[in-house]
Design a protein with these regions (language model features):
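A generic structural signal for alpha->beta connector loops
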Residues: 33, 79-80, 133
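Acidic, PIN/NYN-like endoribonuclease modules and their adjacent C-terminal/linker elements
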Residues: 121-200
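Acidic, metal-binding active-site segment of PIN/NYN-like and related structure-specific nucleases
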Residues: 100-135
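PIN-domain endoribonuclease scaffold, especially VapC-family toxins
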Residues: 37-83, 161-180
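Active-site neighborhoods of divalent-metal-dependent phosphate/nucleic-acid chemistry enzymes
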Residues: 79-114, 165-169, 177-200
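Short His-Asn-centered micro-motif
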Residues: 11-13, 117-118
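Intrinsically disordered, low-complexity and often Lys/Arg-enriched segments
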Residues: 1-6, 196-200
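PIN/NYN-family metal-dependent endoribonuclease catalytic core
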Residues: 8-11, 19-56
Length: 200
């Protein structure tokens, strides 16, 4: 079992933007698989992108307070997650895409072990691991790694996630479909396995 005092992960904005990915990642953090970290800028990016998605919909006026409530709940649930003193850029990250360097520096400030992001190509993964000892992981790979640590606790986390989805409730099939659509294919495959699915 990982110690949350040692295993710290920065969640990039793109991993917090899709609802089901955010919910799974935060549920696993709540079940103490790892310690999540983010910055004000990361918060601003995912909330802005989510607001843009609702901009052309009739629910746009209702979206802003809901998004703000989610952000507030995240900071309240994980009071140590917000990294307030992000370090200035260093020469060790020149190969990282300019728009993502703040994520790396958040990880450095947080002494994080990993960054979870869908934008793997924008991070110089080998360089970060060699020079800063920070891994860059796709959310699906990261979640599967957590599952492999303790499958029983992972199943409990997914059961907890489903139990909180009441308006409307999520069926097992809907959860699996949402995971696949969000790019969590390996995670969905594990949940769909013959020995796990009946317990979900």
């Amino acid at each position: 079992m990982l110690s949350v005092d040692r295993f710290t992960v920065v969640l990039d904005a793109c991993s917090l933007f899709p609802m089901v990915v955010r919910d799974v990642l935060l549920t696993f953090a709540d079940h103490e698989f790892y310690a999540p970290k983010w910055s004000t800028r990361i918060h601003e990016e995912w909330t802005r992108n989510l607001a843009t998605r609702f901009a052309d919909k009739s629910a746009a006026n209702d979206a802003a307070p809901k998004i703000a409530a989610i952000r507030s709940a995240m900071d309240r649930t994980f009071p140590d997650a917000l990294v307030t003193q992000v370090l200035p850029e260093s020469s060790e990250i020149v190969d990282v895409d300019e728009k993502d360097r703040h994520v790396v520096m958040t990880a450095v400030a947080a002494r994080a072990d990993a960054i979870v992001t869908f934008n793997l190509k924008d991070f110089a993964a080998e360089q970060l691991e060699l020079s800063l000892r920070i891994e860059v992981k796709h959310p699906d790979v990261f979640i599967r790694d957590l599952i492999d640590l303790n499958e029983k606790r992972a199943l409990a986390a997914f059961r907890d996630l489903r139990a909180r989805k009441r308006r409307p409730p999520w069926s097992v099939d809907e959860l699996l479909e949402r995971l696949i659509r969000a790019g969590l294919v390996q995670t969905s495959a594990w949940l769909s396995s013959a020995d796990v699915l009946p317990l979900l």
